[in-house]
Amino acid sequence: MTFTLYPAIDLKDGACVRLLRGEMDAATVFNTDPADQARAFHAMGFTHLHVVDLNGAFAGAPVNRAAVEGILKATPAPVQLGGGIRTRAQIDAWLEAGISRVILGTIALRDPELVKTAARALPGRIVVGIDAKDGMVAVEGWAETSDMKATELAKAFEGCGVAAIVATDIGRDGLKTGVNVPFTAELAHAVSIPVIASGGVRDVNDIRALKASGAPIAGSILGRALYDGDIVASEAIEAAG
């Protein structure tokens, strides 16, 4: 299985930021020009981008549209986008705007039929975002924890054309404490849908650990460690290959 790296651009108030454990008031601004950041990642050799509208995740509707459109104009790389996408109309609008894949998180738990219907109609374009704390699904921008296991939610989307699952351990996100390999591997073994690891990646050894897990893990999101310089792009790309 190909292992793809997705540098993350998290958008808050039009800027590229990183959060600690999903807390909006714990945001560090890394670039006030997200399009510039997208160009930089492309120049480093990354072939895909992972973009999150953080304001949108909390508002339940797209907020940073201008910043997203700037990213799309700045790079030829396929962009997957999440954050506040809760309706079929929003899905269609983003795909028409040039987004490669939309990530559906909260709505995957609240209205799984909407997600399944969209995935069947738009094969390869729908990604399910499963954010978990201690193995349980969290929703509404991580403000709430549900009583559903992450593996249970993942299995609900088998066979309907979902392109991938982005699995985030929110207890580790932004902390650089190391990716949760057992959690990601358990999910990857539980379903045939490609699973992408997210949350806590601290260095190139985490990429190697995901690849060496024996689970069919399809890739990893790279966040704070890439911005802080703890991950060198060329080394990460080599490890992923």
Swiss-Prot record:
Query: What do the Gene Ontology cellular component annotations say?
Result: cytoplasm
- A Pfam family that this protein carries is His_biosynth
Query: GO molecular function of the protein, one example?
Result: 1-(5-phosphoribosyl)-5-[(5-phosphoribosylamino)methylideneamino]imidazole-4-carboxamide isomerase activity
Q: Which GO terms describe its biological process?
A: L-histidine biosynthetic process; L-tryptophan biosynthetic process
Major place of residence: cytoplasm
Localized where?
A: Cytoplasm
Q: What is this protein called?
A: 1-(5-phosphoribosyl)-5-[(5-phosphoribosylamino)methylideneamino] imidazole-4-carboxamide isomerase
Q: Which organism is it from?
A: Hyphomonas neptunium (strain ATCC 15444)
